[in-house]
C-alpha cells in the first residue's frame, strides 16, 4: 500500500516531537515495601521527524508499547526508547509516564491505616548525540503554618495545604517513598488520609510548633538534595494554596551538581 507518511515534504522544517499522547496503560512500579505495585499510567511517546518526511508512523508507537506489556516499568526505559528510536528511524525518542502511586500511612497517634495517593511522573529520552536521560518526579501534598501569622497573632495562625513538586536526575535507583519522605519532613506537617481526634490534635499542635514559609520548605528540601551524592540534578517547587489570600504562594529551586 502507499506509504503517505514517507513521502517527501518540501517545507524543509524539522519537527522536534511527534507521536501519541495520553494513552491509558497498565504499568508496574517498584514498591519499597511490597516489591511491586500495579497502577495505570497516562503514556506519551514521541520521536523527532526529519525535515524530508511528511509524517511519522503512529501505529508503531502502540506496537512497541504492547511489546513491553507486563514489563513496563522504569527499569525498561532504555530498552523501550531504543526500540522506539530504531523502529521509527529517529534521532531522538521520548517516553513519559504519569501515574498515581499509593503509600500506606499510619496516623501519628492512633495508628489508623490509610492509603495516600501521590502523583508521579517518569520522563525518559534517548538522543543519538546526547545519550539517555531520565527524570523522576513526585507531587506531594503538605500542610504549612504561616510564621508571620503566628508571630503577630494572639489567637493562632493561618495554615493551608500545599503541593510540592520534586523532580530529580540520579546516578543509582531512587525509591519514590524516599523522595516522598524527604518532602514530608520539610513541611510544617504531613497530610494524612485518616485522622482520629487524638491524631488531629497532634497534627494541629505539631504544625503550629513548626511554622514554614514556602521559602523554608523549598530550601530545606534543596539542602538535603545538595548533600545527596546520588542526585545529579533537581528541581523543587512549592505552591501553598493560601487560606486567607486570593492567591497562592510559590517558591522554586533548580540546581545541577
Curated annotation (Swiss-Prot):
Pathways involved: Cofactor biosynthesis; 7,8-dihydroneopterin triphosphate biosynthesis; 7,8-dihydroneopterin triphosphate from GTP: step 1/1
Annotated site residue numbers, May be catalytically important: 146
Keywords: Hydrolase
Protein's GO biological process: tetrahydrofolate biosynthetic process
Broadest EC class assigned to this enzyme: hydrolase
NCBIfam families reported in the protein's UniProt record: PRK13674.1-1
Name of protein: GTP cyclohydrolase FolE2
Organism: Syntrophobacter fumaroxidans (strain DSM 10017 / MPOB)
